[in-house]
Structure formats: C-alpha cells, structure tokens
Amino acid sequence: MKKLILSLCLLLLPTLSVAGNAGYSVDYIRGEGDVEGIKLAARYNAGALSYISDDILLYWEASVNFWEYGAEDNHDTDFVLAVSPVLVKQIGTIKQAPLFLEAGIGLSLIEDTTFADKDVSTHYQFEDRLGLMMQFGNNNEHHVAVRYFHYSNAGFKKPNPGLDFIALSYQREF
C-alpha cells in the first residue's frame, strides 16, 4: 500500500508542473532521539491573500513522510500523509535573496500510533509548522528552508505527547 501511494504521488508531480503555480519539495527530517526521516511534498501556490494583505501568500502542500527510529536491533518506522495550508510573508532579504517566514496548521494521518517509544493515541494528528525560507535562482524558483514541525492530536484523546521535528528542505517551483 505504501509503495502504491508513493508511486501515485510521484506520478502526479509532473502533472502539477503544467499548472505553473506548482512545485515540489524534499525534506530531511530530524526528530527527538534517533528519529530521522524524509518528506516528499507537492505544493500549489494559491497566491496573495489580498482580502487580508497583498504581501501574505498562501500555498497548499500535500506530503508523504517516512520516519525511522532506533538502532537495527530496536528499529521502528512510521508512514504519514499530510495536507496543509501554509501562510508565507517576506520578512527581509539576505544578499538580494528574499527571506520569508512561513506558518501553517494542517491535518495528517499517521500509520502507527506508537512510534519512537511514544503513544500518540490517534491516527489523525494536526501538523503545525513554523519556518524560514530563502529563495534564489534567476526567477527565484529554488527555495531552501528550515522548519519546525509538531504533530499532535490537540488533546482530543490522551495520551498526547506530540512529536517534534526539525526539517531542512529544498523546494523547486515549475
């Protein structure tokens, strides 16, 4: 099932490119303890939220995450699907490269509710994020970002220890 979903996501990436407002990202994820992972995402840039402010942008991200924890003798993996709206605002420039702050709260579906010695109690989790992103390239089509992610069920069911991650991301717009 995992391979089918991943294959479907990868097949859909090229079709998003014809939209002109799409892109993809690849994140290296590092969590508490020995948690590591990768996040593959497709994103759609919805543009400015002009009813709020012309300089606040919105993009939608759909992602698949693969997490690993522990040594070979005590190894644990998890698989996550997520969809998240993300607000973006330029906060400055560094050597002519635009610097952005981004924040979002989305929904995720976690395959295994026990991961990295934590019981998160529900398969459905909120995916909160806060990050810094820099654009570069001739048309600012390349992005690098550092993001903090927190997964939690918002206290709907106990226990709710949450899972925290830092991600280093490369994004490309079409």
Residue ranges and their predicted role:
Residues 27-28, 70-74, 115-120, 153-156:
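Extracellular loop and loop/strand-boundary signature of outer-membrane beta-barrel proteins
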Residues 40, 136, 162-174:
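Outer-membrane beta-barrel "beta-signal"
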Residues 28-34, 44-46, 62-68, 105-111, ...:
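Transmembrane beta-strands of outer-membrane beta-barrel pores
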Residues 30, 44-46, 50, 89-91, ...:
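Residue-level signature of outer-membrane beta-barrel architecture
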Residues 22-26, 54-62, 99-105, 142-146, ...:
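Transmembrane beta-strands of outer-membrane beta-barrel proteins
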Residues 17-21, 47-56, 92-99, 138-141:
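Short loop/turn motifs that connect adjacent beta-strands in outer-membrane beta-barrel proteins
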Residues 1-21:
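Cleavable N-terminal export/targeting peptides
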